[in-house]
UniProtKB/Swiss-Prot annotation:
Gene3D superfamilies named among the record's database cross-references: DNA helicase RuvA subunit, C-terminal domain (1.10.8.10), Phosphatidylinositol 3-kinase Catalytic Subunit, Chain A, domain 1 (3.10.20.90)
GO CC field: cytosol; nucleus
Gene Ontology biological process terms from the UniProt entry: ERAD pathway; protein localization to vacuole; spindle pole body duplication; ubiquitin-dependent protein catabolic process
Domain UBA residues, every copy: 327-371
More details: Present with 3930 molecules/cell in log phase SD medium.
Positions of the Ubiquitin-like domain: 1-76
Coiled-coil ranges per UniProt: none
Domain of life: Eukaryota
Start and end residues of each stretch annotated as Disordered: 221-270
Protein name per its UniProtKB record: Ubiquitin domain-containing protein DSK2
Signal peptide annotation: none
Biased composition range(s): Low complexity: 231-270
Entry keywords, A to Z: Isopeptide bond, Nucleus, Ubl conjugation
Source species taxonomy: Eukaryota, Fungi, Dikarya, Ascomycota, Saccharomycotina
Length: 373
């Protein structure tokens, strides 16, 4: 007698036949034949419990027609057998790893989407960017050259746009991006909302927006337009223009009058070029506390504001909307139902895990299984 068990993983579903006396490891091998997921990457959940390889299927009281949830995980970087065979090496590696705990912390259990690019697996099959594209000082991002046009043409490629949308739709990839960037980590759940925002995706695939962002990055460079002496040259040159040269002598009165006229003109024309330059309002010296930073003895960029960055990629209509005050059972109704189907019935833990993951069921599931909440 064999059991017909439904395997669920996100939106995917499979049916696997297995004998009740079979071990969970044999059960995973049958699943591998059905969907091709390696046995080492399978985590099976039934009634809120992770199935152990050495236990039998019938020991978990799994009946015919029941559903078992499959969570795909990454293989461990080092097996227990390898660690036991090299005790001295393992001890030294553990000491070395303890010295740099932040290098791989939170990397989604070793998830590295760029691993294949640094190996010989696809050597000769991928056309990598030219060497000067990412040259000194950022290459194409900081120089007005043909390399910048090459990058913009790549943004216009429908295949590239499709790949970007697919990447931002992958929860595991979003976790990797957030956990690899301290600034995104500081944003909390807003980082995931920003990366999933339609406006943010449009910006990544819109050549005009990319061009404006490059110009804005050059203008916000604290060293742009300033010589080694840090004199009176403007730190915010015109978009697309070269940084002004520093003169040997500086007329303080003339610079002051020029700054006042620039503030008046920017205030008069603020909004006239909003469609052409989405960052035009940020370049108004009257509203910019760093407008006269070039005359100071030392300059610096303002502190990173996660809330401000997240608000830049929110649709305008959301700015006037009130904060979502719905109770958790309404806000996370769909996600809570999925967790209940997997056997997680602790309401408080489920809500805490969903808030921690920004509403992602996959992230909440990892938090519940790892005991983070």
């Amino acid at each position: 007698m064999s059991l017909n068990i439904h395997i669920k993983s996100g939106q995917d579903k499979w049916e696997v036949n297995v004998a009740p006396e079979s071990t969970v490891l044999q059960f995973k091998e049958a699943i591998n034949k059905a969907n091709g997921i390696p046995v080492a990457n399978q985590r099976l959940i039934y009634s809120g419990k992770i199935l152990k390889d050495d236990q039998t299927v019938e020991s978990y009281h799994i009946q015919d027609g029941h559903s078992v949830h499959l969570v795909k995980s990454q293989p461990k970087p080092q097996t227990a057998s390898a660690a036991g065979a090299n005790n001295a090496t393992a001890t030294g590696a553990a000491a070395g790893t303890g010295a740099t705990p932040n290098m791989s912390s939170g990397q989604s259990a070793g998830f590295n989407p760029l691993a294949d690019l640094t190996s010989a697996r696809y050597a000769g099959y991928l056309n990598m960017p030219s060497a000067d594209m990412f040259g000194p000082d950022g290459g194409a991002l900081n120089n007005d050259s043909n390399n910048q046009d090459e990058l913009l043409r790549m943004m216009e490629n429908p295949i590239f746009q499709s790949q970007m949308n697919e990447m931002l739709s992958n929860p595991q990839m979003l976790d990797f991006m957030i956990q690899s960037n301290p600034q995104l980590q500081a944003m909390g759940p807003q980082a995931r909302q920003m990366l999933q925002s339609p406006m943010f995706r449009q910006m990544l695939t819109n050549p005009d927006m990319i061009r404006q962002s490059m110009q804005f990055a050059r203008m916000m460079d604290p060293n742009a337009g300033m010589g080694s002496a840090g004199g009176a040259a403007s730190a915010f040159p015109a978009p697309g223009g070269d940084a002004p040269e520093e003169g040997s002598n500086t007329n303080t009165t003339s610079s002051s009058n020029t700054g006042n006229n620039a503030g008046t003109n920017a205030g008069t024309n603020a909004g006239a070029n909003t469609a052409a330059n989405p960052f035009a309002s940020l370049l108004n010296p009257a509203l910019n506390p760093f407008a006269n930073a070039g005359n100071a003895a030392s300059t610096g960029m303002p502190a990173f504001d996660p809330a401000l960055l997240a608000s830049m990629f929110q649709p305008p209509v959301q700015a006037s909307q009130a904060e979502d005050t719905r109770p958790p059972e309404e806000r996370y109704e769909h996600q809570l139902r999925q967790l209940n189907d997997m056997g997680f019935f602790d309401f408080d833990r489920n809500v805490a895990a969903l808030r921690r993951s920004g509403g992602s069921v996959q992230g909440a599931l990892d938090s519940l299984l790892n005991g983070d909440v």
